[in-house]
């Protein structure tokens, strides 16, 4: 079950404390100079809203809503791994991978980004991709998933997919920007499975 989060909006259409990302997003999406942040408890959110915390820094860049967001849902690490890609603006699921029996979170994030690159290239789209995994972003740029997961019969499927993804990266070019989703400033990525 997903943990509750509280979203403080200092600068937005209606400043206040919200209990869901969608409610918070409605106040800040497209709002110039929006300031907001998520907190794990109501008490922390209330203290922050009263100004008992340093005013949060403005995001270095606005969210690019015309983009693709990818994320992984995992049960255990290593454990069952699945991923999906969604339209950042609407939340519409554009692709998803059925659960893989054994894998790691980072491997799933890597596969999700590469799937996103392939998806956008097939559609001649130059939209950027957001991922909340710095590790997976680096692996994609290096064209190599540096996972320490053992290769055996149990992990054969995820390693087959990773090998295929690395092969694709080494035989194709792309101009798609891969951007880090700033969870601490923007809340959970749109593709989040809500299992944290």
UniProtKB/Swiss-Prot annotation:
One of its GO terms (cellular component) is cytoplasm. Changing residue 132 to N: Loss of activity. This is Ribonuclease H. Changing residue 109 to Q: Loss of activity. Binds 2 metal ions per subunit. Manganese or magnesium. InterPro entries: Ribosomal_bL9/RNase_H1_N, RNase_H, RNase_H1_N, RNase_H1_N_sf, RNase_H_bac, RNaseH-like_sf, RNaseH_domain, RNaseH_sf. Mg(2+) 1 binds at residues 71, 192. PANTHER family: RIBONUCLEASE H1. Its main location: cytoplasm. Residues 58-196 form the RNase H type-1 domain. It is found in: Cytoplasm. Changing residue 188 to A: Strongly reduces activity. Pfam families: Cauli_VI (PF01693). One of its GO terms (molecular function) is nucleic acid binding. It comes from Halalkalibacterium halodurans (strain ATCC BAA-125 / DSM 18197 / FERM 7344 / JCM 9153 / C-125) (Bacillus halodurans). GO terms for biological process: DNA replication, removal of RNA primer. Keywords: Cytoplasm, Endonuclease, Hydrolase, Magnesium, Manganese, Metal-binding, Nuclease. CDD domains: RNase_H_bacteria_like. Its cofactor is Mn(2+); Mg(2+). The lineage of its organism: Bacteria, Bacillati, Bacillota, Bacilli, Bacillales. Gene3D superfamilies: Ribonuclease H-like superfamily/Ribonuclease H, Ribonuclease H1, N-terminal domain. It catalyses: Endonucleolytic cleavage to 5'-phosphomonoester. Belongs to the RNase H family. Disulfide bonds: none annotated. It is an enzyme of class 3 (hydrolase).
């Amino acid at each position: 079950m997903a943990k509750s989060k509280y979203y403080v909006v200092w600068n937005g259409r209606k400043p206040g404390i919200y209990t869901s990302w969608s409610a918070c997003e409605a106040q800040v999406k497209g709002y110039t100079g929006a300031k907001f942040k998520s907190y794990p408890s109501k008490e922390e959110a209330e203290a922050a809203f009263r100004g008992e915390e340093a005013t949060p820094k403005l995001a270095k860049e606005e969210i690019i809503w015309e983009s693709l967001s990818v994320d992984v849902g995992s049960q255990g690490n290593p454990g069952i791994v699945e991923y999906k890609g969604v339209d950042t603006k609407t939340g519409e699921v554009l692709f998803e991978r059925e659960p893989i029996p054994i894998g790691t979170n980072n491997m799933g994030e890597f596969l999700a980004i590469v799937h996103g690159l392939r998806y956008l290239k097939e559609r001649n789209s130059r939209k950027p991709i957001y991922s909340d995994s710095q590790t997976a972003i680096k692996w994609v740029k290096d064209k190599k998933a540096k996972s320490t997961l053992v290769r055996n019969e149990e992990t054969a499927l995820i390693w087959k997919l990773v090998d295929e993804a690395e092969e694709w990266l080494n035989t194709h070019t792309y101009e798609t920007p891969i951007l880090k989703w700033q969870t601490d400033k923007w809340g959970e990525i749109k593709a989040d499975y809500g299992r944290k």
